[in-house]
């Protein structure tokens, strides 16, 4: 299980 978050 993996989670990815990106803020620009």
UniProtKB/Swiss-Prot annotation:
Q: Describe the task this protein carries out.
A: This cephalomyotropic peptide stimulates contractile activity of cockroach protodeum (hindgut).
Its Gene Ontology cellular component terms are: extracellular region
Q: Where in the cell is it found?
A: Secreted
Keyword Nucleotidyltransferase listed: no
Which GO terms are recorded in the biological process aspect for this UniProt protein?
Answer: neuropeptide signaling pathway
Is Transport found in the keyword set? no
Recorded protein name is Leucokinin-6
The UniProt keywords, alphabetically, are: Amidation, Neuropeptide, Pyrrolidone carboxylic acid, Secreted
Q: The organism's lineage?
A: Eukaryota, Metazoa, Ecdysozoa, Arthropoda, Hexapoda
Give the domain of life: Eukaryota
Glycine amide modifications at: 8
List residues modified as Pyrrolidone carboxylic acid: 1
Organism in which the protein naturally occurs: Rhyparobia maderae (Madeira cockroach)
Q: What is its main location?
A: secreted
């Amino acid at each position: 299980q993996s989670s990815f978050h990106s803020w620009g």
